[in-house]
Regions:
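Conserved, well-structured ligand/cofactor-binding cores
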Residues: 1-138
Length: 138
């Protein structure tokens, strides 16, 4: 277990949990639906965050480049997972083995991106879910 803190207090999260305290609060505060945010949106957000990190990497001193390279690598890892999910889902219609792969991969993705499609705010919870996933992988 790990303890995370924010301005609202503290929460324990399991060591396997990739997201952080803000995402956990969103899960608890917005149990309005059981439909998760569409992976196409998360994929697009990851592309934007990767592009921003690559841009900043070119603007900072060498000592800071390692941080941005870690962010880009984390984005690449998560982008691959979202691409695999989309690919397996399309193939699953034609092949039972691919259905099993799609289900296994989706369970992995569901453990990373847990925010509900219906939530308060302007997507802040989803943005934090993606940010925390990138940060904890980087």
């Amino acid at each position: 277990m790990r303890l995370e803190k924010d301005t609202l207090g503290e929460k324990y999260l399991t060591d396997e949990t990739v997201y952080g305290i803000n995402t956990q609060r969103a899960v608890e505060n917005f149990p309005l639906s059981h439909k998760k945010v569409n992976l196409h949106l998360i994929h697009a957000m990851l592309l934007v965050k990767k592009a921003a990190a690559k841009t900043y990497e070119n603007l900072v001193e060498d000592i800071e480049k390692e941080k941005y390279q870690a962010i880009v690598a984390a984005c690449d890892e998560l982008l691959l997972k979202t691409e695999e999910d989309k690919s397996f889902s399309q193939q699953a219609e034609h092949n039972r083995d691919n259905q099993n792969q799609a289900e296994d991969n989706r369970r992995g993705i569901d453990a990373l991106f847990v925010t509900q499609a219906l939530q308060g705010g302007a997507g802040t919870s989803t943005n934090m879910n993606v940010n925390e996933g990138i940060a904890n992988i980087a």
